[in-house]
Amino acid sequence: MLNFLPFFKNASEESTLALAGVMQAADLVRQLARNGKMDTPVFQTSIGSLLKLEADSTADVYGGLAGVETGLNTLLLYLNNTQQRDMEVMRYTLGVIILEKRLSRREDLLDAIGIGVEQAIYQTEVFGSPTHANVLAKLAEIYSQTLGTFNYRIHVHGNPNYLQSTDNANKIRALLLAGVRSAMLWRQKGGGRLQFLFHRRTIVSQAEAYLHQLK
């Protein structure tokens, strides 16, 4: 089986970053579906994380802590503020985690994703950007042919005019695939439902500490 995700030491210390990566992708899906646009640099980082097969740390997957700052803030908003948090983002986050769990049992699909991601990396080198339309179309195809075959589907809600756009649909599928990549990394780091139940304060503390480093 081709494992397209690196495994790092000190798993428990880095799971918060990986979870932030999941929520960052989910928040970008929300932005695009509702507004037809999103934070471009953050989008580039999330897609880039999917294409980075070798990294020295979880932070390095996102190009450093700054690359997942939006995700860390989104994570804190969900855990700390029940009034302002956007449940649509949480729904996408949970959906991605469910898909990743089902994917983990399918070595054939993991192999297919790994091969497809390597092809997307080659396309990135050819076209010069991880967010080139052809690269995004390839990533969307990977999602549809693998994760899209499960009975469980993530239903994205938003403005129909934006959702009907082929380019936007490709971006959304690519982001969901990036979210699944982060969810797999999160699980490798010991992430799971019990974390939310018994270690929320620890997650908040870690996220705040990471954000403090960025000041």
Predicted regions: what they are:
Residues 17, 21-28, 88-91, 95-98, ...:
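Charged, amphipathic alpha-helical oligomerization/scaffolding segments
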Residues 54-68, 132-154:
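An acidic intrinsically disordered interaction segment
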Residues 1-77:
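Leu/Val/Ala/Ile-rich N-terminal alpha-helices, chiefly Sec-type signal peptides and the beginnings
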Residues 27, 31-34, 101, 105-108, ...:
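Charged/polar positions within long, soluble alpha-helices
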Residues 171-215:
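Alpha-helical oligomerization segments
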Residues 51-130:
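Long amphipathic alpha-helical segments with strong coiled-coil/leucine-zipper propensity
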Residues 7-21, 57-60, 81-84, 88-91, ...:
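Non-transmembrane, amphipathic alpha-helical segments
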Residues 122-123, 152-164:
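Short, charged/polar, low-complexity loop and linker segments
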